[in-house]
C-alpha cells in the first residue's frame, strides 16, 4: 500500500513537471515573437527581492513597432535599442507586466508610449529617447510604479501635476535633461520617493524649500548642474536624507548653512568643485556623517583650523587629487574620534603635522604618497611612528626638498636627519603670483606656512606698511590663519604685496603682484598719475602720493600739459590735498602729455607723466542734399568774411592799446596761445608771448599763479 501511494505521488510530480514544461514551451515557442528571446529569468524587485519572471527580450532588433503576438503572461518586456516611436494597443493585454524597457528608442511624447491600464507595472525605462515635456497626469494610470527612469532625454518642461498618481514611486531619474528650474510641486504626488537623481540639468539655481515634500528621501544627486551656490534653506524637509552628491558643480565654498539642515546625512560628495579652502565651521556638528569626499578640486589650497569639528561618526575622509592642496592646519580636526581612514595622496602637500594625526585617536590608515614632501623636522613623526597607523603605498613617498634629499625615499632620509626645528615654508599654491582685480572689489590673499615651531605670518604692502593681526585699518584686515583682506580696491592699491612667515629659525617670503583694472603702480615710485576718463574735449586725471612720502611737508604740486597741435604749454599749481583734476576745452583726436611734479620743503621732487589722446568728436550735422549744402556754405562764407574783418579791426585796436601798457603785463607773458584764454580750464595759468616777442623779453621773470581749485574735483 505504501508502495502504491509513493508511486502515485511520483506520477503527480512528473505530471506537474510535464504541465509546467508544456506551458513554458508554449511561451517559448508559439507565443514568442520572431527574433526575440523568451524565457524565465531572475528578476529583482525595486526593494532588491529576488524573483523569477517571464521575460521577453527583444533588445537591439531595430524594430519600428512592438511585436503583436506577445503572451499575456509576460512580466518583463525588454525593447531597448530599437526604433519605436509610437504604440497602438500592443501593451493593453499585458495585464501582468511588471517591467517595461523602452530605453534608446524614438519616443517624443509619453502619451505615445501607450501606458494606459498597466496597473501592475513597477519599473519603467524611458531613458535616451527624445521626450521634450511631461504634461499633467501623463503617468496617472501607473498606480504601482516604483521606478521611473526618464533620464537622458530632452525634457525642458514638467507640469506641476506631471507625477500625479505616483504615490508609490520610490526611485526617480530625471538627470541629463534640459530642465532650468526645479518645482517643489512636482514632488507633492511622490511622498514616498527615496532616490532622486536630477543632476546634469542646466538649472538656473536651487531655491529654498525645493525638496520639502520629500520627507522620505534617502539619496539626492545634484551632480553636474553648474551650481555656484546652495541657499541656506534649500534642503529643508529632507529629514531622512542619508546620501547627498554635489559632484562636478561650480561651488566656490562649502554650503555649510544648507548642510546644517540635513540632520541624518551619512555620505557627502563634494568632489570636483572649485572650492578654494575648507574653513572653520564648514563641517561642524554633522552628527551622523560617516564619509566625506573632497577629491579632484582644482582650486582647493588649504584645510584650515577646525574645518572638521564635532563629527562623532566620521570614519573616512578622502581629499585626493587636489593639485593645489598644499596646507592642512595642525588643528584641522577637532572632536573627530571615529576617523579610521585619511586619504591625502596626490596633492601638493609638503607635510602633515604630527599634531594633526594625534588628534585622531582611532586612525588606522593614512595615505600621503605622491606629494612633494619636505623631509625635515615637520614629518619626523613618520619615522618614529609608534602607533598602529598604516601608511598606504610607503614606497611611493619621496622627498621633494631640501634639494640634497630630492628623489630619495622618506624613511631613508628621516633616519639621517633628526633636527627638531626648521625654517618656515610658505605653501606656494595658497595665493597666486599675479592677479588683476576690478575697482571696488574685495580681495582675499591666503598665506599659509608650515614650520616647527609654528611661524608668525604678517604682510607688507607695496608702500612698506606692515599688516599684522593687531592692525586696525578700514583697508586691510589679517586673519589669524594668514589671510589678508583688502577692501574696496582702488588703482592706488595695486603693487607688490609680500607675505612673511617667521619663526626662531628664520623667515620665508612670497610676493603677490596685484593689478587693478590692468594698472600696476610701482611701489618704489612715490608719485603716480593716471587717466581716469577721456572725452573729445576733456581729460580727467588723478594721482596718488604714497604715504611713505612725508605728505605733511609737501607744499605744492604742479601739473604741466603739453599740447602737440596746436602747441600750447601751461602750468598750474594745485594744493596737495587735491588728487583729481579735469582738463577741459581740449582739441579732439589730439595727443597730450600730462606731467605732475611733487616737491617737499627740502626741494626733493618726484615726477610722473602720462600720455593720452582725446576722443574723436561726434558731429551731429547731417546735410541731406547738395543744394542745402551749397546754400549753407554760402551763408557761412559770408559770416566768416564779416567775422574776419571784425577780428582784424579788434586786433589792430588791441595792438594799439598793447603799446600803451606793454610793460605792465610783461612779467606775466611768455608765449601767445592760439586758443582763447578765457576757454582754458583752470582759468589762471602762465602764458608766454609769441616767439617774436619772446626773443625780445626772454629775461622776464616768470611766476606761475595758483590755480582756482574750487573748480577742480575734490575727491579725498
UniProtKB/Swiss-Prot annotation:
GO aspect biological process, one term: positive regulation of synapse assembly
InterPro entries, A to Z: Cys-rich_flank_reg_C, Dev_Immune_Receptor, FN3_dom, FN3_sf, Ig-like_dom, Ig-like_dom_sf, Ig-like_fold, Ig_I-set
Cystine pairs: 447-499
Signal peptide: 1-25
SMART domains membership: IG, IGc2, LRR_SD22, LRR_TYP, LRRCT
Region (Disordered): 692-716
Membrane topology, as annotated: Single-pass type I membrane protein
Protein name: Leucine-rich repeat neuronal protein 1
Amino acid at each position: 500500500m505504501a508502495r502504491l501511494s509513493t508511486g502515485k505521488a511520483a506520477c503527480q510530480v512528473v505530471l506537474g513537471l510535464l504541465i509546467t514544461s508544456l506551458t513554458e514551451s508554449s511561451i517559448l515557442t508559439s507565443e514568442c515573437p520572431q527574433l526575440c528571446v523568451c524565457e524565465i529569468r531572475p528578476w529583482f524587485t525595486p526593494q532588491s527581492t529576488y524573483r523569477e519572471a517571464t521575460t521577453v527580450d527583444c533588445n537591439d532588433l531595430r524594430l519600428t513597432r512592438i511585436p503583436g503576438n506577445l503572451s499575456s503572461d509576460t512580466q518583463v518586456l525588454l525593447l531597448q535599442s530599437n526604433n519605436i516611436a509610437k504604440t497602438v494597443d500592443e501593451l493593453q493585454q499585458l495585464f501582468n507586466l511588471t517591467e517595461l524597457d523602452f530605453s534608446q528608442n524614438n519616443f517624443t511624447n509619453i502619451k505615445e508610449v501607450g501606458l494606459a491600464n498597466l496597473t501592475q507595472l513597477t519599473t519603467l525605462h524611458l531613458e535616451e529617447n527624445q521626450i521634450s515635456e511631461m504634461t499633467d497626469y501623463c503617468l496617472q494610470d501607473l498606480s504601482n510604479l516604483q521606478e521611473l527612469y526618464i533620464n537622458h532625454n530632452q525634457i525642458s518642461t514638467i507640469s506641476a501635476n506631471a507625477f500625479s498618481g505616483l504615490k508609490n514611486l520610490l526611485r526617480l531619474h530625471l538627470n541629463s535633461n534640459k530642465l532650468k528650474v526645479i518645482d517643489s510641486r512636482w514632488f507633492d504626488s511622490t511622498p514616498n520617493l527615496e532616490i532622486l537623481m536630477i543632476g546634469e540639468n542646466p538649472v538656473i539655481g536651487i531655491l529654498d524649500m525645493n525638496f520639502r515634500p520629500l520627507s522620505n528621501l534617502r539619496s539626492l544627486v545634484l551632480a553636474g548642474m553648474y551650481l555656484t551656490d546652495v541657499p541656506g534653506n534649500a534642503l529643508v524637509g529632507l529629514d531622512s536624507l542619508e546620501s547627498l552628491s554635489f559632484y562636478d558643480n561650480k561651488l566656490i565654498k562649502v554650503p555649510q548653512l544648507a548642510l546644517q539642515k540635513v540632520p541624518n546625512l551619512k555620505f557627502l560628495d563634494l568632489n570636483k568643485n572649485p572650492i578654494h579652502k575648507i574653513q572653520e565651521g564648514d563641517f561642524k556638528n554633522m552628527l551622523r556623517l560617516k564619509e566625506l569626499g573632497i577629491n579632484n578640486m582644482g582650486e582647493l589650497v588649504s584645510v584650515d583650523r577646525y574645518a572638521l569639528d564635532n563629527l562623532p561618526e566620521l570614519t573616512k575622509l578622502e581629499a585626493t587629487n587636489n593639485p593645489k592642496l598644499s596646507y592642512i592646519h595642525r588643528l584641522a580636526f577637532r572632536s573627530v574620534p571615529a576617523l579610521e581612514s585619511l586619504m591625502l595622496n596626490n596633492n601638493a602637500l609638503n607635510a602633515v603635522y604630527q599634531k594633526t594625526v594625534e588628534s585622531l585617536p582611532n586612525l588606522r590608515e593614512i595615505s600621503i604618497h605622491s606629494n612633494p614632501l619636505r623631509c625635515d623636522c615637520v614629518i619626523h613623526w613618520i619615522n618614529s611612528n609608534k602607533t598602529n597607523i598604516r601608511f598606504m603605498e610607503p614606497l611611493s613617498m619621496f622627498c621633494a626638498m631640501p634639494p640634497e634629499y630630492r628623489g630619495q625615499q622618506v624613511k631613508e632620509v628621516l633616519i639621517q636627519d633628526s633636527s627638531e626645528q626648521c625654517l618656515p615654508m610658505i605653501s606656494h599654491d595658497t595665493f597666486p603670483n599675479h592677479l588683476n582685480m576690478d575697482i571696488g572689489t574685495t580681495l582675499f590673499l591666503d598665506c599659509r606656512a608650515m614650520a616647527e615651531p609654528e611661524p608668525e605670518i604678517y604682510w607688507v604692502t607695496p608702500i612698506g606698511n606692515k599688516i599684522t593681526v593687531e592692525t586696525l585699518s578700514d583697508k586691510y584686515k589679517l586673519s589669524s590663519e594668514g589671510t589678508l583682506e583688502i577692501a574696496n580696491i582702488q588703482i592706488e592699491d595695486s603693487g607688490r604685496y609680500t607675505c612673511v612667515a617667521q619663526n626662531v629659525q628664520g623667515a620665508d617670503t612670497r610676493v603677490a603682484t596685484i593689478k587693478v583694472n590692468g594698472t600696476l603702480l610701482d611701489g618704489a615710485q612715490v608719485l603716480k598719475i593716471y587717466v581716469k576718463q577721456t572725452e573729445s574735449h576733456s581729460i580727467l586725471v588723478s594721482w596718488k602720493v604714497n604715504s611713505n612720502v612725508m605728505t605733511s611737508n609737501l607744499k605744492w604740486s604742479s601739473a604741466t600739459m603739453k599740447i602737440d597741435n596746436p602747441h600750447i604749454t601751461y602750468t598750474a599749481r594745485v594744493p596737495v590735498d587735491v588728487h583729481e583734476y579735469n582738463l577741459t576745452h581740449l582739441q579732439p583726436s589730439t595727443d597730450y602729455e600730462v606731467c605732475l611734479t611733487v616737491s617737499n620743503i627740502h626741494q626733493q621732487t618726484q615726477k610722473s607723466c602720462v600720455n593720452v589722446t582725446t576722443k574723436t568728436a561726434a558731429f551731429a550735422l547731417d546735410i541731406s542734399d547738395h543744394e542745402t549744402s551749397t546754400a549753407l556754405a554760402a551763408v557761412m562764407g559770408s559770416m566768416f568774411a564779416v567775422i574776419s574783418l571784425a577780428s582784424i579791426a579788434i586786433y589792430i585796436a588791441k595792438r594799439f592799446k598793447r603799446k600803451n601798457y606793454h610793460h605792465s603785463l610783461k612779467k606775466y607773458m611768455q608765449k601767445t596761445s592760439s586758443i582763447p584764454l578765457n576757454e582754458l580750464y583752470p582759468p589762471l595759468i602762465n602764458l608766454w608771448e609769441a616767439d617774436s616777442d619772446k626773443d625780445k623779453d626772454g629775461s622776464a621773470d616768470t611766476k606761475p599763479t595758483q590755480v582756482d581749485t574750487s573748480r577742480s574735483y575734490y575727491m579725498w
